[in-house]
Amino acid sequence: MKINKEDITIVILAGGKSERMGGQDKGLLQINKKYIIKHLYNICKEYSNEIYVNANRNLATYSEMGLIAWKDILENYQGPLAGMYTSLMNAKTKYVMTLPCDGPLVNHIYFKRMIDINSDFDIRAAHDGDRIQPVYSLIKKDLLNNLKL
């Protein structure tokens, strides 16, 4: 079974403080003079009609790029889980897929593995061979009440 693109909202998580990067908004990083977030957005377009950015600053800049940004519902930069919660609250689709804005190497293989499912699930998370990478997730919207912070 494959999940249809009409059933997925994809949210690129860019709402952090970026303390390890001196406060630079990771969503606005560039490689070869191209914004990473636009690169990710362009890949996401193949897998969903509903693509958003979760950001807590520079919302006007994202808008100028043609992106729609959702600010965290919870205040004070509470981390990626707050972005996931905001995404589940705002999404109108059955599934929400999240990925971080600072992962430019994500490719079509990742998306295909996440949406080509052969069993029922509530949440799927990527695994890099050593650890689970929970910000790379596909979550049923039904889990929203379980996540309430």
Where on the chain are the PLM-derived regions?
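Nucleotide and nucleotide-moiety/phosphate-recognizing core
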Residues: K2-L149
